[in-house]
Protein backbone atom coordinates (compact mmCIF):
# COMPACT_ATOMS: atom_id res chain seq x y z
CA UNK A 1 0.00 0.00 0.00
CA UNK A 2 2.86 2.40 0.61
CA UNK A 3 3.80 2.91 -3.01
CA UNK A 4 0.25 3.14 -4.32
CA UNK A 5 -1.39 5.16 -1.59
CA UNK A 6 -1.48 8.44 -3.49
CA UNK A 7 -5.04 7.64 -4.57
CA UNK A 8 -6.07 7.32 -0.95
CA UNK A 9 -4.79 10.72 0.05
CA UNK A 10 -6.02 12.42 -3.10
CA UNK A 11 -9.53 11.16 -2.44
CA UNK A 12 -9.26 12.28 1.17
CA UNK A 13 -8.18 15.71 0.05
CA UNK A 14 -11.18 16.00 -2.28
CA UNK A 15 -13.54 15.00 0.51
CA UNK A 16 -11.99 17.56 2.84
CA UNK A 17 -12.15 20.29 0.25
CA UNK A 18 -15.82 19.68 -0.50
CA UNK A 19 -16.63 20.11 3.19
CA UNK A 20 -14.60 23.27 3.70
CA UNK A 21 -17.64 25.47 4.06
CA UNK A 22 -18.85 23.61 7.15
CA UNK A 23 -15.40 22.95 8.58
CA UNK A 24 -13.77 25.14 11.25
CA UNK A 25 -10.52 24.79 9.28
CA UNK A 26 -9.67 26.54 6.04
CA UNK A 27 -9.45 24.73 2.71
CA UNK A 28 -5.77 25.62 2.58
CA UNK A 29 -5.17 23.97 5.95
CA UNK A 30 -6.93 20.70 5.05
CA UNK A 31 -5.18 20.57 1.69
CA UNK A 32 -1.81 21.16 3.35
CA UNK A 33 -2.56 18.38 5.85
CA UNK A 34 -3.34 15.88 3.09
CA UNK A 35 -0.23 16.93 1.19
CA UNK A 36 1.91 16.48 4.32
CA UNK A 37 0.52 12.97 4.78
CA UNK A 38 1.36 12.09 1.18
CA UNK A 39 4.90 13.43 1.55
CA UNK A 40 5.35 11.39 4.73
CA UNK A 41 4.50 8.18 2.86
CA UNK A 42 6.45 8.89 -0.33
CA UNK A 43 9.67 9.65 1.54
CA UNK A 44 9.58 6.94 4.19
CA UNK A 45 13.10 5.60 4.67
CA UNK A 46 12.14 1.94 5.19
CA UNK A 47 9.50 1.51 2.47
CA UNK A 48 11.70 -1.16 0.86
CA UNK A 49 11.44 -3.40 3.93
CA UNK A 50 7.83 -4.39 3.24
CA UNK A 51 7.01 -8.08 3.47
CA UNK A 52 3.65 -9.79 3.03
CA UNK A 53 3.95 -11.29 6.52
CA UNK A 54 5.11 -8.13 8.25
CA UNK A 55 1.85 -7.72 10.21
CA UNK A 56 2.00 -11.23 11.70
CA UNK A 57 5.71 -12.05 11.87
CA UNK A 58 7.24 -10.70 15.10
CA UNK A 59 10.76 -11.45 13.89
CA UNK A 60 10.26 -9.34 10.76
CA UNK A 61 8.83 -6.49 12.84
CA UNK A 62 11.82 -6.66 15.16
CA UNK A 63 14.17 -6.49 12.17
CA UNK A 64 12.53 -3.36 10.80
CA UNK A 65 12.59 -1.55 14.14
CA UNK A 66 16.18 -2.62 14.73
CA UNK A 67 17.14 -1.09 11.39
CA UNK A 68 16.56 2.34 12.93
CA UNK A 69 19.12 1.64 15.64
CA UNK A 70 21.49 0.35 12.95
CA UNK A 71 21.31 3.80 11.35
CA UNK A 72 22.46 5.37 14.61
CA UNK A 73 25.16 2.74 15.02
CA UNK A 74 26.43 3.38 11.47
CA UNK A 75 26.55 7.11 12.15
CA UNK A 76 28.47 6.39 15.38
CA UNK A 77 31.01 4.40 13.37
CA UNK A 78 31.30 7.25 10.87
CA UNK A 79 31.77 9.95 13.50
CA UNK A 80 33.80 8.16 16.19
CA UNK A 81 35.46 5.34 14.20
CA UNK A 82 33.85 2.59 16.27
CA UNK A 83 30.37 1.25 16.84
CA UNK A 84 28.28 1.65 19.99
CA UNK A 85 29.99 -0.61 22.50
CA UNK A 86 28.05 0.08 25.69
CA UNK A 87 25.32 -2.58 25.86
CA UNK A 88 23.35 -0.36 28.22
CA UNK A 89 22.57 1.81 25.19
CA UNK A 90 21.74 -0.99 22.77
CA UNK A 91 18.25 -1.22 21.33
CA UNK A 92 16.21 -3.95 23.03
CA UNK A 93 13.13 -4.73 20.94
CA UNK A 94 9.88 -5.77 22.58
CA UNK A 95 9.85 -8.93 20.44
CA UNK A 96 13.45 -9.88 21.20
CA UNK A 97 14.57 -12.46 23.73
CA UNK A 98 16.70 -10.04 25.77
CA UNK A 99 15.03 -7.48 28.03
CA UNK A 100 16.38 -3.96 28.31
CA UNK A 101 18.38 -3.11 31.47
CA UNK A 102 16.31 -1.59 34.26
CA UNK A 103 19.29 -0.41 36.30
CA UNK A 104 22.93 0.54 35.90
CA UNK A 105 25.37 -2.39 36.05
CA UNK A 106 26.98 -2.80 39.46
CA UNK A 107 29.32 -5.73 38.83
CA UNK A 108 32.75 -5.47 40.48
CA UNK A 109 31.94 -1.95 41.65
CA UNK A 110 32.93 -0.57 38.24
CA UNK A 111 32.43 3.16 37.69
CA UNK A 112 29.67 4.04 35.23
CA UNK A 113 30.51 7.71 34.87
CA UNK A 114 31.58 7.13 31.27
CA UNK A 115 27.94 6.29 30.48
CA UNK A 116 27.28 10.03 30.34
CA UNK A 117 29.83 10.50 27.58
CA UNK A 118 28.53 7.42 25.76
CA UNK A 119 25.04 8.91 25.85
CA UNK A 120 26.31 12.25 24.56
CA UNK A 121 27.88 10.58 21.56
CA UNK A 122 24.75 8.62 20.74
CA UNK A 123 22.59 11.72 20.98
CA UNK A 124 25.01 13.63 18.78
CA UNK A 125 24.63 10.86 16.19
CA UNK A 126 20.84 11.20 16.32
CA UNK A 127 21.16 14.97 15.94
CA UNK A 128 23.33 14.51 12.85
CA UNK A 129 20.82 12.17 11.25
CA UNK A 130 17.89 14.40 12.19
CA UNK A 131 19.52 17.56 10.85
CA UNK A 132 20.19 15.82 7.52
CA UNK A 133 16.45 15.35 6.97
CA UNK A 134 14.84 18.00 4.84
CA UNK A 135 11.27 19.25 4.99
CA UNK A 136 9.96 16.45 2.78
CA UNK A 137 11.51 13.56 4.71
CA UNK A 138 11.23 15.04 8.19
CA UNK A 139 8.66 12.39 9.11
CA UNK A 140 11.39 9.76 9.14
CA UNK A 141 12.22 10.70 12.73
CA UNK A 142 9.33 8.39 13.63
CA UNK A 143 11.62 5.37 13.12
CA UNK A 144 13.65 6.43 16.16
CA UNK A 145 10.62 6.53 18.46
CA UNK A 146 11.06 3.05 20.06
CA UNK A 147 14.75 3.68 20.74
CA UNK A 148 14.18 7.22 21.98
CA UNK A 149 11.82 5.91 24.65
CA UNK A 150 14.50 3.51 25.83
CA UNK A 151 17.09 6.27 25.74
CA UNK A 152 14.80 8.48 27.82
CA UNK A 153 14.55 5.76 30.48
CA UNK A 154 18.31 5.21 30.40
CA UNK A 155 19.00 8.91 30.93
CA UNK A 156 16.62 8.93 33.87
CA UNK A 157 18.58 6.12 35.52
CA UNK A 158 21.86 7.92 34.91
CA UNK A 159 20.50 11.20 36.25
CA UNK A 160 19.48 9.54 39.50
CA UNK A 161 23.01 8.18 39.93
CA UNK A 162 25.13 11.16 38.94
CA UNK A 163 23.81 14.38 40.46
CA UNK A 164 27.16 16.02 39.72
CA UNK A 165 26.36 15.99 35.98
CA UNK A 166 22.79 17.22 36.35
CA UNK A 167 23.06 20.01 33.75
CA UNK A 168 24.59 17.82 31.05
CA UNK A 169 22.07 15.03 31.56
CA UNK A 170 19.18 17.48 31.78
CA UNK A 171 20.19 18.99 28.44
CA UNK A 172 20.19 15.54 26.83
CA UNK A 173 16.80 14.77 28.35
CA UNK A 174 15.32 17.96 26.95
CA UNK A 175 16.46 17.07 23.45
CA UNK A 176 15.20 13.48 23.66
CA UNK A 177 11.82 14.58 25.06
CA UNK A 178 11.44 17.18 22.33
CA UNK A 179 12.20 14.62 19.63
CA UNK A 180 9.73 12.18 21.19
CA UNK A 181 7.08 14.91 21.05
CA UNK A 182 7.82 15.41 17.36
CA UNK A 183 7.51 11.66 16.81
CA UNK A 184 4.09 11.67 18.49
CA UNK A 185 2.90 14.33 16.04
CA UNK A 186 3.92 12.16 13.10
CA UNK A 187 2.34 9.11 14.76
CA UNK A 188 -0.92 11.04 14.95
CA UNK A 189 -0.69 11.72 11.21
CA UNK A 190 0.10 8.06 10.59
CA UNK A 191 -2.99 6.96 12.50
CA UNK A 192 -5.12 9.20 10.29
CA UNK A 193 -3.55 7.65 7.20
CA UNK A 194 -4.18 4.13 8.52
CA UNK A 195 -7.85 4.83 9.19
CA UNK A 196 -8.31 6.20 5.68
CA UNK A 197 -6.52 3.26 4.06
CA UNK A 198 -8.68 0.74 5.98
CA UNK A 199 -11.85 2.36 4.65
CA UNK A 200 -10.49 2.55 1.11
CA UNK A 201 -9.51 -1.12 1.20
CA UNK A 202 -13.17 -2.06 1.54
CA UNK A 203 -13.56 -1.17 -2.14
CA UNK A 204 -10.69 -3.38 -3.32
CA UNK A 205 -11.85 -6.43 -5.31
CA UNK A 206 -9.31 -8.85 -3.84
CA UNK A 207 -10.85 -8.86 -0.35
CA UNK A 208 -10.87 -12.44 1.00
CA UNK A 209 -13.33 -13.62 3.64
CA UNK A 210 -12.69 -16.62 5.89
CA UNK A 211 -15.77 -18.44 7.22
CA UNK A 212 -15.91 -21.11 9.88
CA UNK A 213 -18.14 -24.04 8.86
CA UNK A 214 -19.11 -24.64 12.50
CA UNK A 215 -20.07 -21.27 14.00
CA UNK A 216 -20.45 -19.45 10.63
CA UNK A 217 -18.40 -16.51 11.91
CA UNK A 218 -16.56 -14.56 9.18
CA UNK A 219 -13.22 -12.75 9.32
CA UNK A 220 -10.82 -11.05 6.91
CA UNK A 221 -7.83 -12.40 8.88
CA UNK A 222 -6.54 -15.72 7.51
CA UNK A 223 -5.31 -16.60 11.00
CA UNK A 224 -8.97 -16.80 12.05
CA UNK A 225 -9.16 -20.36 10.68
CA UNK A 226 -7.25 -23.37 11.98
CA UNK A 227 -4.70 -24.66 9.43
CA UNK A 228 -6.24 -27.52 7.43
CA UNK A 229 -4.72 -30.92 8.29
CA UNK A 230 -7.13 -33.40 6.72
CA UNK A 231 -9.90 -32.18 4.41
CA UNK A 232 -11.22 -28.85 3.17
CA UNK A 233 -13.56 -28.39 6.11
CA UNK A 234 -12.89 -24.98 7.64
CA UNK A 235 -12.98 -24.48 11.39
CA UNK A 236 -11.95 -21.43 13.41
CA UNK A 237 -9.50 -21.58 16.28
CA UNK A 238 -12.19 -20.79 18.86
CA UNK A 239 -14.35 -23.73 17.75
CA UNK A 240 -11.29 -25.97 17.69
CA UNK A 241 -10.54 -25.07 21.32
CA UNK A 242 -14.13 -25.87 22.30
CA UNK A 243 -13.89 -29.24 20.55
CA UNK A 244 -10.74 -30.09 22.52
CA UNK A 245 -12.49 -29.17 25.76
CA UNK A 246 -15.34 -31.59 25.10
CA UNK A 247 -13.31 -34.38 23.48
CA UNK A 248 -12.63 -37.57 25.42
CA UNK A 249 -9.20 -38.13 23.89
CA UNK A 250 -8.55 -36.17 20.68
CA UNK A 251 -10.68 -33.58 18.93
CA UNK A 252 -11.87 -34.81 15.53
CA UNK A 253 -12.72 -33.08 12.28
CA UNK A 254 -16.55 -32.78 12.10
CA UNK A 255 -16.47 -33.70 8.41
CA UNK A 256 -14.00 -36.58 7.92
CA UNK A 257 -13.58 -37.56 11.61
CA UNK A 258 -9.78 -37.39 11.42
CA UNK A 259 -8.19 -36.82 14.82
CA UNK A 260 -6.46 -33.48 15.25
CA UNK A 261 -2.90 -33.48 16.49
UniProtKB/Swiss-Prot annotation:
User: Which GO cellular component terms, listed alphabetically, does the Swiss-Prot or TrEMBL entry include?
Assistant: host cell cytoplasm; host cell nucleus; virion component
Q: SUPFAM superfamilies given for it?
A: RING/U-box
Q: Does the keyword Transcription apply?
A: yes
Q: Which stretches are zinc fingers (RING-type)?
A: 212-257
Cross-referenced Pfam families, in alphabetical order? Baculo_IE-1
InterPro entries per record: Baculo_IE-1, Znf_RING
Which keywords, in A-to-Z order, does the entry hold?
Answer: DNA replication, Early protein, Host cytoplasm, Host nucleus, Metal-binding, Transcription, Transcription regulation, Viral DNA replication, Virion, Zinc, Zinc-finger
Where is this protein chiefly located?
A: host cell
Task: Mention one GO biological process in which this protein takes part, according to its record.
Answer: viral DNA genome replication
Could you tell me where this protein is found in the cell? Host nucleus; Host cytoplasm; Virion
GO MF, any single term:
zinc ion binding
Domain of life assignment: Viruses
- Which PROSITE patterns would you find in this protein's record? ZF_RING_2 (PS50089)
What's its job?
Answer: Putative viral E3 ligase that plays an essential regulatory role in both viral DNA replication and transcriptional transactivation. The role in transcription has been shown to include activation of gene expression from early viral promoters. Also promotes the efficient egress of nucleocapsids from the host nucleus. May act as an E3 ligase that promotes ubiquitination of nucleocapsids proteins by vUbi and subsequent viral egress for the host nucleus.
Tell me the subunit arrangement. Interacts with proteins C42 and FP25. Interacts with host beta-tubulin. Interacts with Ac66 and vUb.
The protein in question is named: Immediate-early protein IE-0
Source species: Autographa californica nuclear polyhedrosis virus
Which gene name belongs to this protein?
A: IE0
Amino acid sequence: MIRTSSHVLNVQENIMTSNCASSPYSCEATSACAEAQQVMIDNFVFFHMYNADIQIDAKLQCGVRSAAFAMIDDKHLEMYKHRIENKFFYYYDQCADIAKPDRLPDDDGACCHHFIFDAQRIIQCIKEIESAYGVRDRGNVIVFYPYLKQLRDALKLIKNSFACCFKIINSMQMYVNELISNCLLFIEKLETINKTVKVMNLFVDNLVLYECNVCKEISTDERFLKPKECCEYAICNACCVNMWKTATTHAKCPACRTSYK
